[in-house]
């Protein structure tokens, strides 16, 4: 048996020797089919060819290229064109794409992109060749999914976005412009006049009017909330006096490092807040400021306090006081150690308070009407409307209520009790001093009586003094808990 295996082993060794000397078996790839695999895209992936029966990966050292990174893209343009792709981008090893285990490799020689002289590689497993080309333009409708937040729909109207520094202001920052599916910042030159353009941008963002350009030191610190820097410059100013956004800018090649357009609009938030402390009331004292709610109050340092009253007039209005009465810088002996400084001008236009470590000079401001201003227009109108409503109610409901009260009082006066008034059974009469027996023919309705017991009903056998007769009857009989008197029963019910 061992003697039979020796010729086979010798034949195998001879085949390996021939392969190593000749570079492998020659593979016929006439009428080849070419594809890119491992990426899911037909224009990027591992380069593979087929002769109609089997697919082969192309060796990364094909065509004698020791460094494929230095290959000019035009040299493998033909490969991209045969794959029905656009311009070539990269030809390199396929380490970035998924490899297929035990796939056969071919190594080709001659002109780059030619498969006329290829042989099967039987050496150790090496990287295959990868090709990346530009995708062809889409001919189908765009997907219905919404685009990323940084890039609007191609059909969306032009728009702006302000990118502020972390924790920065609203309506202030670096301007990003989006139009036709392209988004980026706007490059400017020092000589550019952006006042009119700034008005257009602030109005489009509903941020009021243009206030001033964003200082370069702050512009360099701006970054997106996600932690990314603003987009690269892709636009430049074409017409600073434009009235339509489409006419303002033109596209440029993306570049980083230039100065991008940044601005501050008048409606920036939060605004600087002020108060007066150390005086007799809230309308008098030295000025303190802070940059929004939740921030600490500190002294306003102002060395230019004698240049105008506009800043102090605004401070008085914010305290809901009258006009400024006087203002003065405090004596040098009263200087504080530090505080906040803001450039000259009204505080509502000061977008950032700068800290001053020393030599901070305070300003003492006195406003007119040291007490709080009177009621506002809204409160006065509310009081007037309330008084008018009360007058209408009195006119409409007053007479009716008066009549009801008078009627109730008269009824109470007429219903006075005639009969025993206490435990001693004393008599109480509400009658005239004399009683006149009226004839039956007299018209009872023609005479006025003071109460309903002035005379008995007609054709009645009841006495004119039933209460008196009842009292005499009780005296003559033994007292008990029962009573035959209608008046006593009536009295008990009333009590």
UniProtKB/Swiss-Prot annotation:
It is a single-pass type I membrane protein. Residues 1-23 form the signal peptide. The chain crosses the membrane at residues 373-402. Residues 24-372 are extracellular. Disulfide bonds join 43-85, 80-133, 108-118, 202-265, 242-248, 283-321, 301-360, 316-367, 342-350. Glycans are attached at residues 51, 117, 323, 369. It is found in: Cell membrane. This is T-cell surface glycoprotein CD5. It comes from Bos taurus (Bovine). The lineage of its organism: Eukaryota, Metazoa, Chordata, Craniata, Vertebrata. The gene is CD5.
């Amino acid at each position: 048996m061992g003697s039979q295996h020796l010729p086979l082993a010798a034949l195998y060794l001879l085949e390996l020797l021939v392969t190593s000397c000749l570079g492998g078996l020659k593979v016929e790839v006439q009428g080849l089919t070419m594809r890119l695999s491992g990426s899911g895209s037909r224009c990027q992936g591992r380069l593979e060819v087929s002769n109609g029966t089997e697919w082969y990966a192309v060796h990364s050292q094909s065509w004698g290229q020791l460094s494929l990174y230095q290959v000019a893209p035009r040299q493998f343009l033909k490969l991209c064109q045969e794959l029905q792709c656009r311009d070539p981008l990269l030809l390199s090893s396929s380490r970035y794409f998924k490899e297929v285990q035990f796939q056969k490799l071919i190594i080709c020689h001659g002109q780059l992109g030619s498969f006329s002289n290829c042989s099967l590689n039987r050496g150790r497993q090496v990287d295959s060749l990868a090709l990346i080309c530009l995708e062809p333009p889409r001919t189908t409708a765009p997907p219905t999914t919404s685009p990323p937040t940084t890039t609007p729909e191609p059909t969306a109207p032009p728009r702006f976005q302000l990118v502020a520094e972390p924790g920065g202001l609203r309506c202030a920052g670096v301007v990003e412009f989006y139009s036709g599916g392209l988004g980026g910042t706007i490059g400017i030159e020092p000589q550019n006049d952006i006042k009119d353009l700034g008005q257009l941008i602030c109005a489009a963002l509903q941020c009021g009017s243009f206030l001033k350009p964003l200082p370069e030191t702050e512009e360099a610190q701006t970054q997106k909330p996600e932690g990314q820097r603003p987009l690269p410059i892709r636009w430049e100013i074409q017409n600073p006096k434009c009235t339509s956004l489409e006419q303002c800018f033109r596209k440029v090649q993306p570049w980083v490092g230039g100065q991008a357009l940044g601005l501050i609009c008048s409606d920036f938030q939060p605004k600087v807040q002020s108060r007066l402390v150390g005086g007799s009331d809230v309308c008098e004292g030295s000025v303190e400021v802070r940059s929004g709610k939740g921030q600490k109050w500190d002294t306003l340092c102002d060395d230019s306090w004698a240049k105008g009253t506009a800043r102090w007039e605004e401070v008085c209005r914010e305290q809901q006081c009258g006009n400024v009465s006087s203002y003065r810088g405090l004596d040098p002996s009263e200087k504080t150690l530090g505080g906040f400084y803001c450039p000259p001008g009204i505080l509502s236009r000061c977008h950032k308070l700068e800290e001053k470590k020393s030599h901070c000079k305070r300003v003492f401001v006195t406003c007119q009407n040291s007490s709080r201003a009177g009621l506002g227009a809204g409160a006065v109108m509310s009081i007037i409307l309330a008084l008018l409503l009360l007058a209408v109610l009195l006119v409409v409901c007053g007479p009716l209520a008066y009549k009801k009260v008078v009627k109730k009082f008269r009824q109470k006066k007429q219903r006075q009790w005639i009969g025993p008034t206490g435990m001693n059974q004393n008599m109480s009469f509400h009658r005239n001093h004399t009683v006149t027996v009226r004839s039956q023919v007299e018209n009872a309705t023609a005479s006025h009586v003071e109460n309903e017991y002035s005379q008995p009903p007609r054709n009645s056998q009841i006495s004119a003094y039933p209460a008196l007769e009842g009292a005499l009857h009780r005296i003559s009989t033994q007292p008990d808990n029962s009573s035959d008197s209608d008046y006593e029963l009536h009295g008990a019910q009333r009590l």
